[in-house]
Each structure stands twice: as structure tokens, then as C-alpha cells.
Amino acid sequence: MTPAPVPGRPDTAATLAELRAGLSERIGVPVLVENDAAAAALGEFWSRRVPREQAFGCVYLSTGVGAGFVFGGALFRGASSGAGELGHLSIRYDGRPCPCGNLGCVEQYASTSATVRAAREHPELRARLPLDGTGSSAYDAVARAAVNGDPVAYAVLDQAAEHLSRAATSMANLLDLGRLVLTGPGVALAGSIYARRLRGHLSRTAHSRQRHSVTVELSAQPRDAAGIGAAVLVVQASVAPGHTPGVAG
């Protein structure tokens, strides 16, 4: 499968509808389509038995940066199922250009792809880490070195975590979240670095800090979170179809 269309393109909904219909016709069963961050949020919400009344959010770190939200026990999708594009929140008005058309998107600074690019700018890291492989293997090499005490690798990852924490704090402020889970392949090896940064930033700047804390947790299965959420979607479609739009078949 090809990546999802760039945020903001008008053909996104039509592309997903065609994908659902085509797959359903080909395999002969109903088909659900959901983005990875939203699916991960739903899976984390169900597996953690979060109270329905709690405003729950999930940050999904991979080659992009996404978010998912569960309010009142239901996944929040927005007007066109495009809610949660955290990666395209600008943190620098004159920053790096993004394919979405904006400047300074957090995805250009905090995604696993951005972290690998930053690591490759350090000759000492290129000399001792396998950074010429695939994006995922190169990122894992940086993350592993960071948690094992490499100061340069740690600095690169910590800077990415700082960028992500600023965007995630803005998200928590905007939605008055009570719990936030970090998940996705990007936190599988070095989640503690991201969690420490986010907890510190929330404790200093979250608007709700005098009323309630924002609990930050790490996913128990960050690499599989989206797949687990997809399974939850299937279960939810059978027991609460009103919360699962876009079923083809």
C-alpha cells in the first residue's frame, strides 16, 4: 500500500472510499480503514480500561507524527476523519518547509525520519553507527546508542523529544487532556527520553496543572499499537457500529 495522501489534499476522502470499496469487493468481506495514530489511540484506550469520562489522547511517533483522541469512549475523527495531524502543527513560523505546504511542522523536527537526518549531520555518529541503512534501522541505532549512554546520540534524540513535547503540550492544552500515551515505533527503544521531556514540559506549562495533572504513559507494545487498535476497530464495529464509520461491504 502507498502512504496516505498529504494532509490538506481534497482527494483524501475519495481515495479512502475507493480503497475500502476496492478491497471489500476483492476479498469479499467488510473493510475498515483508519490511520495508524487513531487506531493506536483506540487500542490503548480499550486495553487500559480508561474511564469513558476521561479525555484521552495518544501521540504516535514514527516516520511521521500523529495523534488520536477518545472522548466519551468514542474515537474523535473530526469533520472529514482528519483529526490528529499533530505532525503538521507548526512550531517555527519560519522553519523548514513541509510537503503539506506549511513551514516549521513538528514532523520536520521530531519524527524518526527527522531524527535520522539530524544524526547524519554528526560525523562522529556516522563513524560509529549504521546510519546508511533503512530509516527504521538507522533510527533504532540512534535510539539504542542514546539509551546506552552515547552523549551525542542522546543529545540528538533529546532535542527531538523537546520539539515533540512542545507540540504535545499545546495539544493537551487545547483539548484539556487527562491522560496521554506515547506510542509507535519511535518510542519502542527510547520512550523514557520522550516521556521524561513531555512530563517536564507539562508540569511547567500545562494550563491545567493547578487543577489536574496530565498523566503521561508509555505504550506496552508501541510497535504493535496500531495493529492492536485495528483489531479493536473490528470488535467495535460488531458491538457498537455507530462509533465505527466508513465500513465497506
Predicted regions and their residues:
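ATP-binding/phosphotransfer module of carbohydrate and carboxylate kinases, centering on a glycine-rich
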Residues: 21, 25-29, 47-51, 102, ...
